Amino acid sequence: MFNMALVFFLIAVLAGILGFAGIAGTLAWAAKVLFFAGLILTVVFYLLGKRTPPV
């Protein structure tokens, strides 16, 4: 439990540093692009997996 608290604390400190440095906006844009790319790939692979395999 203490390990998880330490990990979340370090993530919060890193987020604070990035936020005050002005890098957070660029990283948020990159995260949004990666999220939508992953979402599109998930849908594509789901639809491709629904086909019956060739005999």
UniProtKB/Swiss-Prot annotation:
Keyword tags: Cell membrane, Membrane, Transmembrane, Transmembrane helix
Subcellular location: Cell membrane
Annotated membrane topology: Multi-pass membrane protein
Bilayer-spanning residue ranges: 4-24, 27-47
Chief place of localization: membrane
Cellular component terms (Gene Ontology): plasma membrane
Presence of keyword Membrane: yes
Keyword Oxidoreductase tagged: no
InterPro entries reported in the protein's UniProt record: DUF1328
Homology family: Belongs to the UPF0391 family.
Protein name: UPF0391 membrane protein NE1120
